Amino acid sequence: MKNILKIFLILGLTGLLAAGCSDFLKPLANGSYNEDNYQDYPSIVRGFIVKAYSLRPDTYYTTEFIGAEAGTDNAVYRNQTNSTRQFSVGTTSISANPFRAVWTRSYQGINYCNMFLKDRVGINTHYLLDHESDMVLRKTLQGDAYVLRAWYYYDLLRTFGGIGTDGNLLGVPVLTEPSEAENLDPASIKRATFDETVEQILRDCDSAEVYLPFNNRDYPDDKVYSTPITGSARYRCFDQISLNGLRAMTYLMWASPAYNPTGDKTRYQKAAEYAAKVMNHKLHVESTFTGGFDPAVGFSWQDLNNPEIIFISSMGNSTTMETSLYPQGFGGSAGIVPTQQLVDAFPAENGYPITDARSGYDPKKPYEHRDPRFEAAIFHNGSEVRRNTNNELMYTIESAVGGKDAPGLTGTSPTSYYIKKFVFSGWNPYDENVVSSVHAVFYMRWEQMCLIFAEAASKVTSPNDGSMFGISPKQALAYLRNRPTTEGKPSYVAQNGDPYLDECAASPALFEALVKNEWRITTCFEGNRFFDLRRWTANPSDLSAINVEIQGVSITGDAESGYTYTPTVIERKNYPSIWRPLPYLDVRRCPNLVQNAGWESWK
């Protein structure tokens, strides 16, 4: 512990303590702490966990969320010089890896956790005068350290795991001890296998479960879970429910074709089991609270206390979403916009794909009678922006040729579409007193657990079978398709039946395709699309799912005489590999750090 305050990782983390710990590594007023007695100062030790939590992104408008979608067939950057756009079309340079921040941040977070766990310094530190409360806090912080380390390794593995240039399926370097700069040999930094990295994540989850509170909710009749230390006081922190969510996410990734060459179905079963645990808690425990969870009730992205949430980031009041996603005519910049392919992925209101004649889809009126989730996620020509409080019309999207929001103008979408999901409809740049809203990232939420369960459970039982897990895969998808939108608009299939879901549930192949499309539309702009396309790819040399032509639409005509819709090509993705590259400089520094296949020149 002598050199604990000098710790940093060679993996892109030089200066960690100088920059990262300055917020909490402060002496008392008389300056009386040093390297030997720093554990006497609980704010320092607790600060390791506080800092590890604070490193998580707190806005969807980053490279990892909406930006990541722009690397797929869901969205595109308006700015052609954006590093993520250049990366996806094959014109990037080795110095412009847009995902390096994930690598750096994750290893910073891991190192803070390792510092807390080293020699049990964190759990042996006294934080509070009241003994009972102090012991509860010690346990929760110990659980936080383990699960945050698991979380950051999951993030690293999802981003950088893959087949290396040596032909092996690799994970990331696994470090479970604080690293001292003067003793760290760059040659010792090696990637664990993919399986070994998963096993480390699951071990940390098992360790965390011993210490974490059951649920970050207030239980008035339970003394332990109603202390000021647990319950809602820990909102935004992990509990055993979100821990099981992390397990479900990890097992689903591990079970997927890209990472499961032997086709081990027990991984799918574990993913389904943990997702079902989370779902059952929502359905049978949180549903009993006042204002608790109800799967038949929608939610708002601006309601950061809504029971949809399982694990959430820190929150902040900002206008980033609005100024980045609206067109310039309404105070925005159209930084990232939806594609025609994503628009086409939303079914008709009766649940059928628009490619199915039974959908009633009319290509001359492409936005009519669509699944209401489409209108809640995407602005199209003719969409109205209405104030959330009184339904006042504030703006109308005019993206037909000649309109104020048409492609080719400053600050307008090249595809003719704009992202509606996440924007606050109480914001108007022309108000005398502009109102903003709180925003956060919903890292885990109810709908995501439904998707994990539907996908995983359908691999080990039939879509209609609810006997194995207490819920059927079909029911999990029905929860999504029957639910009112985030704007409160009712589901057509909830009121009139969902024959297409019934049809798909009778065919494993159709059900699998439906699950994949529900992943796409339910979590659009949340950063999952690239990872989903990759994990579903059994042959790593098959790039057809990611190297696609990105389309928009050119709209001519007017409302009176009718519109004509002509597909346009915006760009073509040109990835050399389904794997993302490790940061170039770190591969150069560490001679035994194997680069991912397809990025041989980045070493």
Can you say where each PLM-predicted feature lies in the sequence?
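Long, intrinsically disordered, low-complexity segments
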Residues: 20-21, 78, 106-109, 194, ...
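Conserved, well-structured interaction surfaces
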Residues: 54, 82-162, 184-217, 363, ...
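C-terminal substrate/ligand-recognition segments
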Residues: 372-482
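Bacterial Sec-dependent N-terminal signal peptides
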Residues: 1-31
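Membrane-proximal, proline-rich intrinsically disordered regions
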Residues: 21-72, 291-297, 347-368, 378, ...
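Short, surface-exposed recognition loops and adjoining beta-strand edges that mediate ligand/DNA contacts
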Residues: 36, 62-81, 129-133, 161-176, ...
